[in-house]
Curated annotation (Swiss-Prot):
Transmembrane spans: 307-327, 328-348, 361-381, 393-413, 490-510, 547-567
Compartment annotation: Membrane
Identification of the protein by name: Probable palmitoyltransferase AKR2
Keywords, in A-Z order: Acyltransferase, ANK repeat, Glycoprotein, Lipoprotein, Membrane, Palmitate, Repeat, Transferase, Transmembrane, Transmembrane helix
MF GO annotations: palmitoyltransferase activity; protein-cysteine S-palmitoyltransferase activity
Entry-linked Gene3D superfamilies: Ankyrin repeat-containing domain (1.25.40.20)
Family per record: Belongs to the DHHC palmitoyltransferase family. AKR/ZDHHC17 subfamily.
Role description: May be involved in constitutive endocytosis of a-factor receptor STE3.
Cytoplasmic compartment segments: 1-306, 349-360, 414-489, 568-749
Extracellular side: 382-392, 511-546
Gene for this chain: AKR2
Domains (record comment): The DHHC domain is required for palmitoyltransferase activity.
Swiss-Prot/TrEMBL ANK repeat ranges: 49-79, 83-112, 117-146, 150-183, 189-218, 222-251
GO terms under cellular component: fungal-type vacuole; fungal-type vacuole membrane; Golgi apparatus
Lineage per the UniProt record: Eukaryota, Fungi, Dikarya, Ascomycota, Saccharomycotina
Length: 749
């Protein structure tokens, strides 16, 4: 903990005294008359009293009182407190931009050290993550090379704030431009910013520092390296990042403890062992031989494994009873999945993510294709011969949908979802940050810390693609790709085709089962089923278990895909994407059950054009970094169970489906504008969900090329970044505010 922590956090928050009280006192204490001014300046007790008023006003951001006091000459803004924090310090701590700017323009010294740690206003602003204040101070001559009594500089304090955006700012505007501020700056204990970030468990900061070239091998006075600190902090992603960067497992600290000893003592042994396993090491830190030298071979093996599983299930269904075949199939599936996780996944690269899961591999696309191939095999060998004479058209439709399924699947796997190209040059990144700061929009909603570029509206960073995806909807493991602006319509065509294809297969299966019933008409024991009450299904399970098992598997997928299509069509009708629906659900849930009002910052809603206008600067501690989080540990046991259950539902997509059904039948009105008043500030709600359903359908199904024939606009997706939104053509790669509807002017985002 730094020396700044000596001051209690309550002392740096907004005081409980109302601004009106301070203003009233100031109006009596500070007068424009020369007599009163002389009286105040001549009386030491009165001067101290006015200084107290000045400090309280600086804390509260009461610019009027601050101006009155300063212009009266009652205080010296560079000597307004002795051995304590000045008005400028308090304004910087509490993120009072207008007050800080006024004091700096009046000649306040930004490099004055104050407080028990001898920190400057820049140090305090960085400590509390106040980006706009830091930018203001640097523009008014604050020296970023200064250190406090503990040897901490702006780089340490920005990391200590846990504000990744401030770390980005300092790296690109201070470290890059000043040779005296090093990314591996050391405090009096020889701790670098990377050691601090690892100890705090800030994986975003650690990743950024490593990307910027921070030294992993550096140790502090206690002999702790970055991996030691990460094991104390207990964040697995940080541990994984440092292992990937070559951290030494066996290096010992001053207490002769290596990483294994430290993990044992800190209770992070399991996290450390999992991280080692994720990156191809055994529990002792020895590099394990990889089963595949090339990651492409590992991916191909994962893709083929479902085919082997399907062949196995088919073969055992021919020789074993249905119950035993199901049990063995489940057992082999579990063994296969665990084998892939243990031996094959470690062979894959960790691009854009700290560990690889099976859903981010070709496994599910292989499962889809193997199911499709098995389905075609059963149709060719069994269903077609029995049904071609009676159901010719159904078989023709099945053949056509089979062809379309293959074509659409291959196109989707290779399609571009709408990834934005990144300009990672230093000049481009600095210009983007500077532009966002001037607009008052340098926040996580408008800036992507993974790609270091401005985020267009409705875009989202994809760890799978490693890029921002325009109008991002979701990642689909079945097509091994993201779904976004350029392939969303193609994905819906694919899903509808697959759904109808499965329907035809199930229909032909039932016809096949009925037609083969005559074989067992005289053998009653074969028609006895303990679970199946339907005679057709019962006889089908006894006569042809392999076809019956495939029928059940297809039926399950038919139900699941049908529910997904209901959600997709509902979202298309409302003009929103899956992440946007989740945002609205989360917003509604928090307001209803946890009594949280969504944070509203005037910096995002003001029509002013820049941060120079003091009225649009966020006033309040860390106003630029406030986020809403829910701690499960802090909830009542009943609410904790509900939160865990809700998380599981979200992962399975059940929440999404339930909300859709409730909206359709009118039980809830999340998307109809009938919500508490505090939600109406949401631009997402005010624009997207209030568009007419016909407009939303047109936006999705027709591309923006109005010169093309209607059928072509419907069936073809645009290869460019342009599409319709609210009936207006927009460029989704540069969409930074929603287009205004006719007769309406919307606030910029």
């Amino acid at each position: 903990m730094t020396s700044m922590s000596i001051i209690d956090d309550e002392n740096v928050k907004k005081t409980s005294n109302g601004a009106a009280v301070v203003t009233d006192v100031a109006q009596h204490a500070v007068s424009d008359s020369d007599n009163n001014k002389a009286q105040l300046l001549g009386d030491g007790s009165n001067t101290e009293y006015v200084v107290d008023i000045f400090i309280e006003a600086a804390k509260d951001g009461d610019l009027k009182v601050v101006k009155d006091v300063v212009e009266s000459g009652a205080v010296d803004i560079n000597n307004d407190r002795i051995d304590e924090l000045s008005g400028l310090h308090w304004a910087c701590i509490n993120n009072r931009f207008s007050v800080a700017k006024f004091l700096l323009l009046r000649g306040a010294n930004p490099n004055q050290a104050a407080g028990p740690g001898g920190a400057t206003a820049l140090h305090w602003a960085a400590r509390y993550g106040n980006i706009y204040i830091v930018d203001l101070l640097l523009k008014h001559g604050a020296d970023p090379t200064l250190k406090d009594e503990q040897g901490l500089n702006i780089m340490h304090f920005s990391v200590y704030s846990s504000n990744i955006l401030l770390v980005v700012y300092v790296l690109y505007f201070v470290v890059n431009n000043n040779d005296n501020v090093d990314i591996d700056s050391k405090d009096n204990n020889n701790r670098t910013p990377l050691l601090w970030a690892a100890y705090q468990g800030d994986f975003l900061t650690v990743e950024l520092l490593l990307k910027f070239g921070s030294t992993v091998a550096w140790t502090d006075n206690r002999g702790f390296n970055a991996l030691h600190c990460a094991l104390v902090g207990g964040d697995q992603r940080v541990i994984c990042d440092l292992i990937l960067s070559g951290a030494n497992f066996y290096e010992r600290n001053n207490q002769k403890q290596d990483c294994f000893d430290l993990a044992e003592g800190m209770g992070t042994k399991s996290l450390f062992e999992q991280a080692l396993q994720h990156h191809g090491y055994d529990r002792l830190g020895n590099q394990k031989d990889k089963l595949f030298k090339k990651s492409s071979h590992a991916q191909f093996t994962i893709f083929l494994s479902p085919f082997l599983l399907m062949v196995y299930i088919y073969l055992i269904s021919l020789v074993l009873s249905p119950v035993l075949a199901i049990m063995l199939s489940l057992l082999v599936t579990v063994v296969m999945v665990n084998t892939l996780k243990k031996f094959v996944l470690p062979c894959l690269p960790r691009k854009n993510t700290y560990k690889v899961s099976l859903t981010r591999t070709p496994f599910f696309s292989g499962l889809f294709l193997s199911t499709f191939c098995f389905l075609i095999y059963i149709w060719t060998k069994k269903l077609y011969p029995y049904s071609v004479s009676d159901y010719t058209m159904k078989n023709v439709q099945f053949l056509v949908t089979s062809f379309l399924t293959v074509v659409l699947f291959l196109r989707l796997v290779r399609s571009d979802p709408g990834c934005l190209k990144t300009d990672d040059s230093l000049t481009s990144i600095q210009e983007t940050i500077k532009q966002l700061i001037d607009l008052g929009k340098f926040d996580r909603e408008n800036f992507c810390v993974e790609t270091l570029e401005r985020k267009p509206l409705r875009s989202k960073y994809s760890f799978f693609s490693g890029a921002l995806v325009a109008r991002y909807d979701h990642y689909c493991p079945w097509i091994y790709n993201d779904v976004g602006l350029k392939n969303h319509k193609l994905f819906v065509f694919f899903a509808v085709t697959v759904q109808y294809h499965m329907f035809l297969f199930m229909w032909l299966c039932l016809a096949y089962f009925k037609k083969t019933n005559y074989i067992y008409e005289q053998v009653e024991e074969y028609a006895r089923c303990a679970l199946l009450k339907n005679e057709t299904l019962c006889k089908g399970s006894n006569y042809d278990p392999s076809t019956f098992f495939l029928f059940i598997w297809i039926s399950v997928n038919f139900i699941w895909l049908g529910a997904m299509l209901i959600v997709q069509f509902f979202q298309i009708l409302k003009g929103i994407t899956t992440p946007e629906l989740f945002i609205l659900i989360k917003e509604e849930h928090k307001a209803k059950f946890i009594n949280l009002i969504p944070f509203e910052n005037s910096i995002y809603t003001s029509e002013s054009k820049g941060v120079e206008d003091s009225d649009m600067i966020p006033e309040g501690p860390s106003a630029t970094t406030i986020t809403h989080t829910i701690s499960i540990d802090g909830l009542e046991p009943r609410n904790r169970r509900r939160a865990i259950l809700s998380a599981c539902f979200s992962m399975m997509g059940i929440n999404q489906w339930l909300v859709t059904i409730k909206e359709i039948v009118g039980i809830t009105h999340i998307l109809h504008g009938q919500v508490p008043q505090q939600h109406h500030s949401s631009l997402l709600r005010s624009f997207l969900v209030t568009n007419h359903w016909k407009t939303n359908l047109t936006d999705f199904w027709l591309n923006s090329d109005v010169t093309a024939p209607l059928w072509q606009r419907f069936f073809y997706s645009s290869d460019t970044s342009k599409a319709m939104l609210g009936g207006t053509e927009v460029d989704y790669y540069e969409l930074y505010e929603y287009p205004a509807r006719e007769g309406e002017v919307l606030r910029p985002n």
